[in-house]
From Swiss-Prot:
Organism per entry: Saccharomyces cerevisiae (strain ATCC 204508 / S288c)
Comment field (misc): Completely overlaps NCS2.
Protein name: Putative uncharacterized protein YNL120C
Amino acid sequence: MIKVDTSDALLKNSLTSIKWTLNMLDILFSCDIFSLIKDSIRSLITETFSSVNTVSTSTVKPVRLLCCLVCSNSKSCTISNITRDPESECDKGSRILETDPSFSNGYITLNRFLKYSSFIICFLCLVLTNLMKHSSQNFSFLDSTVAGFLADAGHLWHSIT
């Protein structure tokens, strides 16, 4: 059995950072956006496989969903539902898709998703910078690089909130 000396300041700081990170991720993943995505995917699968529409219509639904998720005009890309019309397109994210009463009455905006993503990036950079500050002076170049990246992520965060 390997014994770990928890009196070491670096190790203590690392364990605290990891514990804090896990707690924050736990809080983050309990947010409504993730349950909303889960419910939306469940509804999508149910609708796709129990649909009375043609096979081509059922097949094109997930494709249109992906089209809207990766559309170029991300800030205005809103998914309230996947429309039943196979000819309809996301139109670079500027269009809101039709709402189906059978679908969950929530909605997903890519803008909100980007906010959560940028928060995770900022948070992980903060933890990494904190760990490197206490580890060794050899990381000074890397530390400044991460600090710069953290600043960029912070600017991104403020620009979309």
